[in-house]
Amino acid sequence: PFAVFYPPIEHSMTTTLYRPVGPQELKLIKESGWTAFPPRLPDQPIFYPVTNEPYAIQIARDWNVPASGSGFVTRFEVETEYLKRFPVETVGAREHMELWVPAEELEEFNRHIVGKIEVTRSFPE
């Protein structure tokens, strides 16, 4: 369903990223005051925000809903300079681009989020 290439959207100081989440992760984000993602579980060594909303929608709708009954797309801004340390990985089709943040660096990553994490879509609709 994707026809165009979606690199991260860079603004002068921040880059827009997306993260598909299930209801439990969304609850923890809300408990943070919409400012941080929760620590990864022991079997989750990588935190992987994605670079475009269509890919986040696909994951939330096609993976999170079957796994947990609902899925949500979050959008947030991160300091562009900080993000340069993380490679953008293409997993599958060329629009399936993710940043791979080691779980042990997530707390630091959260400190570089600018503003609030917001929900842009929810599934089922």
Please give the residue ranges for each predicted region:
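Short, Lys/Arg-enriched N-terminal segments with co-localized hydrophobic residues
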Residues: 1-12
